[in-house]
C-alpha cells in the first residue's frame, strides 16, 4: 500500500503544476518579438544605428566618438560626444552624466565610462536607456542594447535579424 502512495502523490503534484513553458509565457502577450540585430533609433533626432539586442549583457553601450567629460558650472559632470548613424550623419550631444560605470575588460582590468540616459526606439518599443559611452570601433554593432532596457518589453529571437517593422516613426533631420 505504501508503494502506491508515492506514485499517486507524484501524479497529483504534476497535475497541479503547470508546465514550465506555460508558466513562462504568462504576462508576455504584450511583449514585442525582435531579432537579435535590428535598426535602433537613437536620441530625439532618431539617428539610426545598427544594433545588437544582447540578452547576455546587463547594460547598454553605444559607440561614442570624441568623448570629453567636463564640469558644468564647476560642479556637475557633463559629457560631450558624437554619434554616427548608418547613413554617415554625425550628431553632437552634450548632456549630464548620470554616473560612471566600471567595465571589466576581456583582457583583464577595468575601464571607467560615463553613463547617460538616451532615448531609443527599436521596433516601436520606446524608452530611456541607461547607456555607457564606449569606443566600439572594433565591434560589428555601434549600439548594444542590454537586459535593463529589454526586460518586460522585448523578446529576442536569436535566430532572426531585422524582423522589426519600422514603427519608430522618426526621420533623420537636424
Functional labels for PLM-detected ranges:
Residues 18-20:
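N-terminal signal peptide c-region/cleavage motif recognized by signal peptidases
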Residues 1-10:
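Bacterial N-terminal signal peptides that target proteins for export
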Residues 22-174:
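Pepsin/retropepsin-fold aspartyl endopeptidases
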Amino acid at each position: 500500500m505504501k508503494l502506491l502512495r508515492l506514485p499517486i502523490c507524484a501524479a497529483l503534484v504534476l497535475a497541479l503544476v503547470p508546465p514550465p513553458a506555460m508558466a513562462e509565457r504568462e504576462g508576455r502577450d504584450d511583449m514585442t518579438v525582435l531579432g537579435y540585430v535590428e535598426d535602433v533609433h537613437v536620441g530625439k533626432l532618431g539617428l539610426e544605428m545598427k544594433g545588437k539586442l544582447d540578452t547576455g549583457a546587463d547594460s547598454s553601450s553605444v559607440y561614442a566618438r570624441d568623448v570629453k567629460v567636463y564640469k558644468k558650472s564647476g560642479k556637475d559632470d557633463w559629457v560631450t560626444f558624437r554619434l554616427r548613424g548608418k547613413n554617415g550623419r554625425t550628431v553632437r550631444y552634450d548632456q549630464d552624466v548620470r554616473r560612471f560605470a566600471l567595465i571589466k575588460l576581456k583582457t583583464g582590468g577595468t575601464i571607467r565610462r560615463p553613463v547617460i540616459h538616451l532615448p531609443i526606439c527599436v521596433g516601436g518599443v520606446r524608452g530611456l536607456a541607461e547607456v555607457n559611452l564606449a569606443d566600439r570601433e572594433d565591434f560589428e554593432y555601434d549600439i548594444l542594447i542590454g537586459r535593463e532596457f529589454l526586460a518586460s518589453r522585448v523578446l529576442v529571437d536569436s535566430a532572426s535579424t531585422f524582423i522589426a517593422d519600422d514603427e519608430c516613426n522618426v526621420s533623420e533631420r537636424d
